[in-house]
């Protein structure tokens, strides 16, 4: 008789683990999407600056005479 009760408990534990895994994966996907959006915004800002005045943008990164 005890074996009859073990199987449903094992299935329930497996289902809970699957649910936890699915929740973790969904959270990771959301975080990944958020990071991609932030990166896209940064790249858009750089592209906009280069379209406006590329020379000034590049010169802001160039050292001048011993700086």
Curated annotation (Swiss-Prot):
Pathway the protein acts in: Protein degradation; proteasomal Pup-dependent pathway
Keyword Ubl conjugation part of the UniProt annotation: no
Record keyword Acetylation present: no
Region annotation Disordered: where it falls in the sequence: 1-36
UniProt feature coiled coil, ranges: none
GO molecular function: proteasome binding; protein tag activity
Any one GO BP annotation for this protein: protein pupylation
A Pfam family: Pup
Segments for region (ARC ATPase binding): 23-61
UniProt keyword annotations, A-Z: Isopeptide bond, Ubl conjugation pathway
Isoglutamyl lysine isopeptide (Glu-Lys) (interchain with K-? in acceptor proteins), cross-linked positions: 67
Known function: Protein modifier that is covalently attached to lysine residues of substrate proteins, thereby targeting them for proteasomal degradation. The tagging system is termed pupylation.
Assembly notes: Strongly interacts with the proteasome-associated ATPase ARC through a hydrophobic interface; the interacting region of Pup lies in its C-terminal half. There is one Pup binding site per ARC hexamer ring.
Written domain comment of the UniProt record: The N-terminal unstructured half of Pup provides a signal required to initiate unfolding and degradation by the proteasome but is not needed for pupylation, while the C-terminal helical half of Pup interacts with ARC to target proteins to the proteasome.
Family: Belongs to the prokaryotic ubiquitin-like protein family.
Protein name: Prokaryotic ubiquitin-like protein Pup
């Amino acid at each position: 008789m005890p074996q009859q009760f073990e199987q449903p408990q094992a299935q329930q534990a497996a289902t809970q683990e699957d649910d936890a895994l699915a929740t973790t994966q969904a959270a990771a996907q959301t975080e990944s999407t958020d990071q991609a959006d932030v990166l896209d915004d940064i790249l858009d800002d750089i592209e906009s600056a280069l379209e406006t005045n590329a020379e000034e943008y590049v010169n802001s990164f160039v050292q001048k005479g011993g700086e």
